[in-house]
């Protein structure tokens, strides 16, 4: 899989691995790299079947497949210990890795994640799938901002959204791949295994997230043995983009306490 390691200026800096959400592209984290590389080496990657990691995903593709793909990459790089941060679907990958290879994770940060399906998110993804199948990629990509960002941020960032949408269409992963990734996140369920996860975990959620109710993160904070929740008031589903300073401050305070 395509990956990049952005190096900290300090020798022997701890490694932070970033896993993006449904879109799968490492580009999602671009606004955060300057802050994160002050104290950490940062590995970003394009998920299989997205961006610069072309692949035809199998019909039974799952979050476990995604976790195994990332573990294969980390093994190939000789990485034996790291911090992990995942956004939404990327957070599900983190939960799966915490079950498969707990000794790898020094800590994990899960942003607007969940442990099992919920009716609200299921409704959102049903609408998004219908848009993709009935109206095509252009309508799907244009609607994406409505699920990710607060209304005032969308109104103030038209030029950026136009650029992002043009990039998303130019690198569209294909309908089959996208539907299989959506199916993977819709069927993910590790509810019965949460008590086994001992990894120090920070859960970041947003009250105004339209796609994933913040109560999903609250439930994770209650069910994971070594977790705490920080609830941000503003930012939608992607507050690292829409309101980065509170997000980055919360994240770095946690990471620095773990290192």
UniProtKB/Swiss-Prot annotation:
Keywords: Hydrolase. Its EC number is 3.5.1.-. Signal peptide: none annotated. It comes from the Bacteria. Belongs to the AB hydrolase superfamily. Hydrolase RutD family. This is Putative carbamate hydrolase RutD. Involved in pyrimidine catabolism. May facilitate the hydrolysis of carbamate, a reaction that can also occur spontaneously. HAMAP family: RutD. GO terms for biological process: glycerolipid catabolic process; nitrogen utilization; uracil catabolic process. GO terms for molecular function: hydrolase activity, acting on carbon-nitrogen (but not peptide) bonds, in linear amides; triacylglycerol lipase activity. It catalyses: carbamate + 2 H(+) = NH4(+) + CO2. Pfam families: Abhydrolase_6.
